[in-house]
From Swiss-Prot:
<dbReference type="GO" id="GO:0007616">
    <property type="term" value="P:long-term memory"/>
</dbReference>
<dbReference type="InterPro" id="IPR009464">
    <property type="entry name" value="PCAF_N"/>
</dbReference>
<dbReference type="GO" id="GO:2000036">
    <property type="term" value="P:regulation of stem cell population maintenance"/>
</dbReference>
<dbReference type="GO" id="GO:0006282">
    <property type="term" value="P:regulation of DNA repair"/>
</dbReference>
<dbReference type="GO" id="GO:0045893">
    <property type="term" value="P:positive regulation of DNA-templated transcription"/>
</dbReference>
<protein>
    <recommendedName>
        <fullName>Histone acetyltransferase KAT2A</fullName>
        <ecNumber>2.3.1.48</ecNumber>
        <ecNumber>2.3.1.-</ecNumber>
    </recommendedName>
</protein>
<keyword id="KW-0103">Bromodomain</keyword>
<dbReference type="GO" id="GO:0051302">
    <property type="term" value="P:regulation of cell division"/>
</dbReference>
<dbReference type="GO" id="GO:0106227">
    <property type="term" value="P:peptidyl-lysine glutarylation"/>
</dbReference>
<dbReference type="GO" id="GO:0001819">
    <property type="term" value="P:positive regulation of cytokine production"/>
</dbReference>
<dbReference type="Pfam" id="PF00583">
    <property type="entry name" value="Acetyltransf_1"/>
</dbReference>
<dbReference type="GO" id="GO:0022037">
    <property type="term" value="P:metencephalon development"/>
</dbReference>
<dbReference type="GO" id="GO:0001701">
    <property type="term" value="P:in utero embryonic development"/>
</dbReference>
<dbReference type="InterPro" id="IPR018359">
    <property type="entry name" value="Bromodomain_CS"/>
</dbReference>
<dbReference type="GO" id="GO:0031667">
    <property type="term" value="P:response to nutrient levels"/>
</dbReference>
<keyword id="KW-0805">Transcription regulation</keyword>
<dbReference type="GO" id="GO:0048312">
    <property type="term" value="P:intracellular distribution of mitochondria"/>
</dbReference>
Length: 830
């Protein structure tokens, strides 16, 4: 986007001229330029009737949410008051309307009269009394020029009622802006209000429509806009997810866009306090555009209004994202009790992660989502289904149909169920199936999703969970829990930075690199400072920086070798007064996710004796799987240090892993409690210990088997410890199963063309081709996973097809065969 060479200076922070003073002749007021700063304006006179100010004053509030009725729509109450005021004046008798317009109309008695507006000889003594006073007579003389009112409104005699009402709407907006200029404390904002005030006055005078002209340009100011970029981000990052999870991300994106459209930006003065000087001029241009085209028109609807996310792009988003993200997350955290339970988890758990991933694409150097020709053809079943992403009526309003994503081409969630089923044997499970038959079809360990969702609502509902406040960390909380919470609240930030010669790194990055050099030098005293400085500022090295309160408190310096398939970790440190807070673990987790994104799945590092413990906790091992030929001569060797390796799993969301495990444990605990509540029988206590018995087998405890407990001792002994041996065994077994005559229905995934509703009935589809791919990718780390998938192949077939079908007969034959082979290979009990 081509930006103006300098920020516009709308007009000086002078007061507007009195409402009855002469106004300039032109209708389309050019957007103010710096040259206008030398032209003072007269002191204002009282407004005819005070009205609501434009949505959300920005002078003292800064960036954040206004104090309107709806916390997500700053200024909504001002907008309502303005609408009510306009409805009042439009309902006045025509004589009263002409009187109000006469106040803004020049006298036409003769060419020598310079009166720019009729002054009532009997002005109202109190605010809003002008509506209660009787209409002035057209013959009533002006207090200033002593010409009758008729000479001021003669041009309105043959004007339609609709045009009169349009002009009256601008009158109310002028009154609003007049009050805003008085109330506003910020100089830049006051200047824009004053400029718009003059523009609307001239439009009333000349009966034209307002047009903002000058160096600001006209919308849209950037392409692609913010909305398109965010939707590209969802497609780019989440198209591989299941439809339900992908729809969740889509709804989060729409919620973010909606909040951004009603968010109040910080003033240029506030922006200047936290940013480097070269960014301020560009931000001031965008801020002025935002006021003129987006913010003020929310309540002054005489001005054309545009959505922030439709007319701005990456430039503005880069300027505001960090502070907006922090304030938005803090707002939702404070108002979490206002959220409906099913949305609380969505916002408090998934939204922070969503914003973190979006931040990487906003500030990343080569993100494809901002390319004008971004295309990512969706695979089968990856199209997003636009739905109103309402979170709560008290927090985020429902989406307008005019926003992107609500086209007629959207998929219907119920469309698949209405298609006629082609002729064939496959059909749903008969309704008359007995309970015992249904139990037999289930794969061991399956839990109904309805039950899991119910438990999730319980453990995320503060009212349903007794005990201490969840925001207080327990003694056995995960190491990175504190850091994760601080990141969600915007207290800490993570940025991948590095020195650059072409183009030259900006000032903020250079300051952070100096801070990193100081942290590494202080925490690694045995490492020469010159050596640290050389690597930190080397353009080939990057650093994941941990930022708190605008300063660097830690980081991991690394060098990527994409052609060799690994990254070397060079330095890793957190400043001493910020340690033992989980920052080191969270740093490493962010680094892992960054490398998964760039398809590098191995870390190598030389750890000294003090760092070995830390790296072991982060999943590093002294067992090096990367061939020596791939790293020899590439990485730096240190005397007395130990080479360690960490292999990354691309399926693991590392920054949320401990939180996910915690949630899984809570779910299991609640499910166990529900299971225990279903067991009505109460057994007497054990008396054997009174007789001197010190220990008994667990299986001898009365009622233990009824709870679902099973002895695990025998199964543990059969687990193959050697991964290569397990892989070979399972590979041979799967090959025998695939060659069985009855395996033909299960060789490949079921095609939708053959069974349109299959994936609605079967929640966890599996087939022998998928199992082969999983085996090849070393998914089956235990034989239990392999056996479970085999069982699910059979269970899915029996659930979807009638018992007497050919498919079920094949399933039964194959089941007997593979159980025989499993027993023969010693993989299950005989």
């Amino acid at each position: 986007m081509a930006e103006p060479s300098q920020a516009p200076n709308p007009v000086p922070a002078a007061q507007p001229r009195p409402l009855h003073s002469p106004a300039p002749a032109p209708t389309s007021t050019p957007a103010p330029s710096p040259a206008s700063a030398s032209t003072p304006a007269p002191t204002p006179a009282p407004a005819p009737a005070p009205a609501a100010a434009p949505a959300g004053s920005t002078g003292s509030g800064g960036a954040g949410v206004g104090s309107g009725g709806d916390p997500a729509r700053p200024g909504l109450s001002q907008q309502q008051r303005a609408s009510q005021r306009k409805a009042q004046v439009r309902g006045l008798p025509r004589a009263k309307k002409l009187e109000k317009l006469g106040v803004f109309s020049a006298c036409k008695a003769n060419e020598t009269c310079k009166c720019n507006g009729w002054k009532n000889p009997k002005p109202p003594t109190a605010p809003r009394m002008d509506l209660q006073q009787p209409a002035a007579n057209l013959s009533e003389l002006c207090r200033s020029c002593e010409h009758p009112l008729a000479d001021h409104v003669s041009h309105l005699e043959n004007v339609s009622e609709d045009e009169i009402n349009r002009l009256l709407g601008m009158v109310v907006d002028v009154e609003n802006l007049f009050m805003s200029v008085h109330k506003e404390e910020d100089t830049d904002t006051k200047q824009v209000y004053f400029y718009l005030f003059k523009l609307l006055r001239k439009c009333i005078l000349q009966m034209t429509r307002p047009v903002v002209e000058g160096s600001l340009g006209s919308p849209p100011f950037e392409k692609p806009n913010i909305e398109q970029g965010v939707l590209n981000f969802v497609q780019y990052k989440f198209s591989h997810l299941a439809p339900r999870e992908r729809q969740t991300m889509f709804e989060l994106s729409k919620m973010f866009l909606l909040c951004l459209n009603y968010w109040k930006l910080e003033t240029p003065a506030q922006f200047r306090q936290r940013s480097q000087s070269e960014d301020v001029a560009t931000y001031k241009v965008n801020y002025t555009r935002w006021l003129c085209y987006c913010h003020v028109p929310q309540s002054c609807d005489s001005l054309p209004r545009y959505e922030t996310t439709h007319v701005f792009g990456r430039s503005l988003l880069r300027s505001i994202f960090t502070v907006t993200r922090r304030q938005l997350l803090e707002k939702f955290r404070v108002e979490k009790d206002k959220l409906v339970p099913e949305k609380r988890t969505l916002i408090l758990t998934h939204f922070p992660k969503f914003l973190s991933m979006l931040e990487e694409e906003i500030y990343g150097a080569n993100s494809p989502i901002w390319e004008s020709g971004f295309t990512m053809p969706p695979s089968e079943g990856t199209q997003l289904v636009p739905r109103p992403a309402t979170v709560s009526a008290t927090v985020v309003p429902s989406f307008s149909p005019s926003m992107g994503g609500g086209s007629n081409s959207s998929l219907s969630l119920d469309s698949a169920g209405t298609e006629p089923m082609p002729a064939g044997e496959k059909r749903k499970l008969p309704e008359n199936l007995t309970l015992e038959d249904a139990k037999r079809l289930r794969v061991m360990g399956d839990i109904p999703m309805e039950l899991v969702n119910e438990v999730m609502l319980t453990i995320t509902d503060p009212a349903a969970m007794l005990g201490p406040e969840t925001s207080l960390l327990s003694a056995n909380a995960a190491r990175d829990e504190t850091a994760r919470l601080e990141e969600r609240r915007g207290i800490i930030e993570f940025h991948v930075i590095g020195n650059s010669l072409t183009p030259k790194a900006n000032r903020r990055v250079l300051l952070w690199l100096v801070g990193l050099q100081n942290v590494f030098s202080h925490q690694l005293p045995r490492m020469p400072k010159e050596y640290i400085a050389r690597l930190v500022f080397d353009p080939k090295h990057k650093t994941l920086a941990l930022i708190k309160d605008g300063r660097v408190i830690g980081g991991i310096c690394f060098r990527m070798f994409p052609t060799q398939g690994f990254t070397e970790i060079v330095f890793c440190a957190v400043t001493s007064n910020e340690q033992v807070k989980g920052y080191g673990t969270h740093l490493m987790n962010h680094l892992k996710e960054y490398h998964i994104k760039h398809s590098i799945l191995y870390f190598l590092t030389y750890a000294d004796e003090y760092a070995i413990g830390y790296f072991k906790k982060q999943g590093f091992s002294k067992d090096i799987k990367v061939p020596k030929s791939r790293y020899l001569g590439y990485i730096k060797d240190y005397e007395g240090a130990t080479l360690m390796e960490c292999e990354l799993n691309p399926r693991i969301p590392y920054t949320e892993l401990s939180h996910i495990i915690k949630k899984q444990k809570e779910i299991i605990k609640k499910l166990i409690e529900r299971k225990q509540a279903q067991i009505r029988k109460v057994y007497p206590g054990l008396s054997c210990f009174k007789e001197g018995v010190r220990q008994i087998p667990v299986e001898s405890v009365p009622g233990i088997r009824e709870t679902g407990w099973k002895p695990l001792g025998k199964e543990k002994g059969k687990e193959l410890k050697d991964p290569d041996q397990l892989y070979t065994t399972l590979k041979n077994l799967l090959a025998q199963i695939k060659s069985h005559p009855s395996a033909w229905p299960f060789m490949e995934p079921v095609k939708k063309s053959e069974a349109p509703d299959y994936y609605e009935v079967i929640r966890f589809p599996i087939d022998l081709k998928t199992m082969t791919e999983r085996l090849r990718s070393r998914y089956y780390v235990t034989r239990k996973l392999f056996v479970a998938d085999l069982q699910r192949v059979i269970a899915n077939c029996r659930e979807y097809n009638p018992p007497d079908s050919e498919y079920c007969r094949c399933a039964s034959a194959l089941e007997k065969f593979f159980y025989f082979k499993l027993k023969e290979g010693g993989l299950i009990d005989k």
